Amino acid sequence: MTRYKAIISYDGTLFSGFQRQSQARTVQEEIEKTLQKLTGGQGIQIHGAGITDAGVHAYGQVIHFDLEQKRDPEKLRFALDTQTPDDIDVISLEIAADDFHARYHKHFKTYEFLVDIGRPKNPMMRHYATHYPYPLDIAKMQAAIKDLVGTHDFTGFTAAGTSVKNKVRTITAATLTQDPKTGFLVFTFSGNGFLYKQVRNMVGTLLKIGNGRLPIEQIRLVLESKNRQLAGPTAAGNGLYLKEIIYEE
């Protein structure tokens, strides 16, 4: 068996998420179907570093899979890239160590979240940025977002129903900028892992702070209380991008 590691990007608009589901179109299923075709019917399972939800996009998702036969990496990348649907792109592909695991090898992820604050909104970007038409104090949000940096228990920012018991994560960087060309707000979060809907819940809380409906200290309050009810609403998935994954040596 030869293990392969690939970096892929995808437009999440028409996917029900990354992970295979019954009666739903997913990124995992489309890639596995293509690999099955390329290998003459072998059943191949891929493993992703991040499990993105419906409508969420990726610039730099990492996957791995095993093939019985050794293939030229660039030829395999080209075949996968050209035979998967147009909303999936295979950026790079290489042979990996036998013990490499896309999800469980220690890594840092970076997520980006785009918010269209235009009035009116840009209809061409409706699948790629979340629209927020209400007044916002950007400086307030830039001050509040700093409270997310560090090692915290993020229970108050995760969705109900998660099976993960340890909710302590480290965020190494959290920033908010405004794109000078589009005017969109760009929230960027880097860390050693993120809980289910954590990024979207953090963005939803920051937007409420920017709109004056929550105080600037609310981030600290949610972290200390671990109370989801004190956080803002979950921002829509269409503004979220899995930007980059970096593995430790």
UniProtKB/Swiss-Prot annotation:
CDD domains (UniProt xref): PseudoU_synth_EcTruA
Keyword hit for Isomerase: yes
SUPFAM superfamilies: Pseudouridine synthase
Top-level division of the source organism's lineage: Bacteria
Example of a GO MF term: RNA binding
Keyword Cytoplasm belongs to the record: no
InterPro entries according to UniProt: PsdUridine_synth_cat_dom_sf, PsdUridine_synth_TruA, PsdUridine_synth_TruA_a/b_dom, PsdUridine_synth_TruA_C, TruA/RsuA/RluB/E/F_N
Residues annotated as binding substrate: 111
Pfam families: PseudoU_synth_1
GO BP annotations listed: tRNA pseudouridine synthesis
Gene3D superfamilies noted in UniProt: Pseudouridine synthase I, catalytic domain, C-terminal subdomain, Pseudouridine synthase I, catalytic domain, N-terminal subdomain
Keywords linked to the UniProt accession: Isomerase, tRNA processing
Entry's EC annotation: 5.4.99.12
Active-site residues, record numbering mapped to chain: 53 (nucleophile)
Reactions it catalyzes: uridine(38/39/40) in tRNA = pseudouridine(38/39/40) in tRNA
UniProt family annotation: Belongs to the tRNA pseudouridine synthase TruA family.
Function: Formation of pseudouridine at positions 38, 39 and 40 in the anticodon stem and loop of transfer RNAs.
Assembly with partners or alone: Homodimer.
PANTHER family from the UniProt entry: PSEUDOURIDYLATE SYNTHASE (PTHR11142), TRNA PSEUDOURIDINE SYNTHASE-LIKE 1 (PTHR11142:SF0)
Protein name (record): tRNA pseudouridine synthase A
Gene that encodes the chain: truA
